[in-house]
């Protein structure tokens, strides 16, 4: 079955932002307090983006890949807010959770990014990692409670790559640390090329579960995606609904059906050249619509009937 490709092939850097379709505008247009219709860019939802804590020889830095910031601005139409990997900086875990809850309540969406680091295995009762495995305990200590509280408080959540793995662990699932060493699994790692477009090139198909959220959003049963991960889902979390698998059976997407708001996790990277790819834009459009809906409610603005 011929599928769509979930990453663009163009190399142009300057891109215009596509206008919303009439259907999207009918469904998600906000109405200003004055009663005048607002266009899609008139209200930018606040979207928090997860950060990594990295040492670069000159100290420790909270970092976010530029592609995630650009996707939040241009594909979501959001004002991005970087969420530092605060870890245990507030002392006791309860203080960290209280701080995160204050942050969550001010956000209209959360975007969980990818990262070369692995979730520490003690969070899912896994075996010790091999020597040299990259970890980010401060990020784990931030994102795992952030995920649970964002979902339970009705904040739209879109998770990418490591973000998917974090959501699975946060909700009680487990991970393969090295998917390519699991019997029957392909190597899901990317090439080691200095050319980013080579690393993010189409790698394999994913089969989409009929009738699920992803199927409803894309209208496709198969798409082709990039692949840049060694870690992956082993046991799917009890609250998660499988949305897509690779041809080797590896989990590629899941949703959280009991979440009050949009909650979707992808193993691939739709943020890479998102504006050039219709599949990626359908996903970001759905996340954006959910974020605008929360922004309207949070600011006390009326919202037209949501799309079915």
Question: Language-model features: where?
Answer:
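N-terminal beta1-alpha1 cap of cysteine-dependent amidohydrolase-like domains
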Residues: 4, 15-158, 169-176, 180-217, ...
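Compositionally biased, low-complexity flexible segments
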Residues: 7-12
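Glycine-rich beta-to-alpha active-site loop
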Residues: 159, 164
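A short, structured beta-strand/loop element
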Residues: 260-262
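Active-site-proximal beta-strand elements of phosphoester/diester hydrolases
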Residues: 264-267
